[in-house]
């Protein structure tokens, strides 16, 4: 005995109508994809407190908090700029004023490679549909 709900029937109708629409990952709807594609590159981040941090991106989370390794912290608040070397640092997104990406980095190719990685990982976890059994006579 199968019970169908109206909600399920509506969802089925909506899925068939929207099957032609192109799927866009949530990461590509924000700047998150840019910074995750830049993982492993060296950038300069200026904070709201007028400090500059130069380091290598190791991780970026969904809230755009950036983790840098081998970072050099320059405090421009004082007359004599003091440089500090930090092994790892986590920068909260609310403290970032702007991020300087080097000119030598081609963002188009990086984003293209990153989108290929996402699609490959998506295919890896996608379920395959079973073939229907052959008809019996």
UniProtKB/Swiss-Prot annotation:
SMART domains: Sm. It holds the Pfam family LSM. GO terms for cellular component: cytoplasmic U snRNP body; nuclear body. Residues 30-105 form the Sm domain. Gene3D superfamilies: 2.30.30.100. GO terms for biological process: mRNA 3'-end processing by stem-loop binding and cleavage. SUPFAM superfamilies: Sm-like ribonucleoproteins (SSF50182). GO terms for molecular function: histone pre-mRNA DCP binding; U7 snRNA binding. PANTHER family: U7 SNRNA-ASSOCIATED SM-LIKE PROTEIN LSM10. This is Putative uncharacterized protein DDB_G0291015. It comes from Dictyostelium discoideum.
